[in-house]
């Protein structure tokens, strides 16, 4: 084999009248009037190669044997195409290579699907033949984009004195958060390592060790139910610092993201990002990760409807709940009664009992609940800024149910009504988070982020007496309705960390058993510290304009956490189980 001159997709005017050696895959072969044209593809793109029997009979005869996905090496001269043959849709559309020599490096069977973007192949088949799927230009470009993101991040953090430090994959299982993936120890029978859900404690210990600024682009593992933007193994951009305020950590983060946007998309974004408290986000958008690319907001109408004779509204208000509305401007004729019934069923997954609604017509409000609101119709129209052609949708229940239901409806309407400007990248900080959430099923408070989050100084005294009122030095960065990442200042004294564990229901013995190494470390002069972790997969997905992180991961799992290509997970041999002292008692095939 001869040395390659350049990539197929990089053939340009620089190579005119020069001889080049190209290597790649046959995208397409055409025989036109005795002249063979091959579209030769590699990771950088496609170039047209011409085989004229008058130029080289031997090369023409070999080219005639080529079929799609054959791997070939071509030598020839780069020339300009005739004007009528220029293809403006191709990066190399002005040029072609007049071949003088060709070598078939490997043949290929007929592929189970065509190697092109618009092939309408189901996801399971794509994943079974992932190595073929990755040859498609869109997938190749997604993986290259991901590389550009990580390259830019490393460059930025290196330039700001962050150290890239690896942390262990084999660690200790802890009860907080999602389920762990466990790894049995052969040497220590009955004992298990856990694959890390994040390097949280290790990066805190690195701060205690004095490294000051740490980062790692690190693989993490969570055994949880999957959805479009989640995988059992995923990649975090993990950052930790000492002696910085939340605002300083946020500044580093947003400047890093601005650099990523500039390098990958050629877009200059404004910094600092807007900031919004958690309470404000929930009140205005019904979401802690609002999509601010469109303006529809939740409207509190409790004062307007507090005296109406509608039991649903009254019951909610009497029990300390909320009554809120959404105004879908100009959407009345787009949603039938059946559509509204379907929306009512949709919100049931968020705990709502239904979705009340009204349409604004020339002669007033019309709909299933209009008769209950006759006396306040003018006030309701004013409060919601309603006009003829609008449709009002109402949630009445516990505050968290109203927020979740209407927030989800808002997001759905934004997509269905085409309200979202897909060209926008709206970044946002959500700050001032509650430190705890109440788990109804467990009957106790759990960490809203993780148990190492620093409470706001003014709230510490209420940790034991009123946990629900305690706020955290925590912050999430949001992009277009997706949580990109979250961070916080961390607890750096043993006394406060023990109080935190106590509030979460740990006994002293449990805390020492599970987190004793951290508690002991806090006795040795731990500095104030904090950081953030960002989802690389999700960031790459949004930059690529995809809707599923599988599209930016080279070898992902499917919705059942299975790799259809290599059939992982799989059964293992009895000998392997015996060596690990594991007895599998029952398998549901």
Curated annotation (Swiss-Prot):
InterPro entries according to UniProt: Aa-tRNA-synt_II (IPR004364), aa-tRNA-synth_II (IPR006195), aa-tRNA-synth_II/BPL/LPL (IPR045864), Asp-tRNA-ligase_1 (IPR004524), Asp-tRNA-ligase_1_N (IPR047089), Asp/Asn-tRNA-synth_IIb (IPR002312), AspRS_core (IPR047090), GAD-like_sf (IPR004115)
Entries under Gene3D superfamilies matching the protein: Bira Bifunctional Protein, Domain 2 (3.30.930.10), GAD-like domain (3.30.1360.30), Nucleic acid-binding proteins (2.40.50.140)
Subcellular location: Cytoplasm
Magnesium found in the keyword field: no
Keywords assigned by UniProt, alphabetized: Aminoacyl-tRNA synthetase, ATP-binding, Cytoplasm, Ligase, Nucleotide-binding, Protein biosynthesis
Record keyword Mitochondrion present: no
GO process terms (BP): aspartyl-tRNA aminoacylation
Annotated positions binding L-aspartate: 176, 222, 449, 490
EC number, UniProt record: 6.1.1.12
Stretch list, region Aspartate: 200-203
Main location: cytoplasm
Superkingdom of the source species: Bacteria
Residues binding ATP, per UniProt: 222-224, 231, 483, 535-538
Annotated function: Catalyzes the attachment of L-aspartate to tRNA(Asp) in a two-step reaction: L-aspartate is first activated by ATP to form Asp-AMP and then transferred to the acceptor end of tRNA(Asp).
Subunit structure: Homodimer.
Record protein name field: Aspartate--tRNA ligase
